[in-house]
UniProtKB/Swiss-Prot annotation:
Record protein name field: Probable gas vesicle protein J2
InterPro entries according to UniProt: Gas-vesicle_GvpA-like, GvpA, GvpA-like_CS
Keyword Thylakoid in record: no
Biased composition (Basic and acidic residues): 1-10
């Protein structure tokens, strides 16, 4: 018996979609372009809203997120050592200003006593 090929000339082996790439190619494409997944969960009981959860998920590379204007990880002290340093530097500057003001006030009172 002979096996016959019943496909039309030029027909690909996967007619219902593009040829599948590797998982790495798919991940690279998603991180390069970014993907947004949005959803809402709402729980009502007798027309009384008990719970509403709004989910927004943005999956992208750091560069793509920065292009989209998202950079919260740079300012969150729990995630960025630079943010923690910035917070400490601001606190240090405030404390120095307070110390200078207190020393100035103490100098004025000791000068008035003399």
């Amino acid at each position: 018996m002979t096996d016959l090929d019943h496909r039309y000339p030029g027909e690909e082996t996967e007619p219902y979609g593009p040829p599948s790439g590797s998982l790495a190619d798919l991940l690279e494409r998603v991180l390069d372009k970014g993907i947004v997944i949005a959803g809402d969960i709402k729980i009502d009981l007798l027309d009384i809203e008990l719970l509403t959860i709004r989910l927004r998920l943005f999956i992208a590379s750091v560069d793509t997120a920065k292009k989209a204007g998202i950079d919260w990880w740079e300012t969150d002290p729990a995630l960025s050592s630079r943010a923690a340093r910035d917070a400490l530097a601001e606190e240090n500057a405030r404390l120095r200003e307070r110390l200078d003001a207190l020393e100035g006030a103490a100098g004025e009172t000791t000068g008035a006593v003399r």
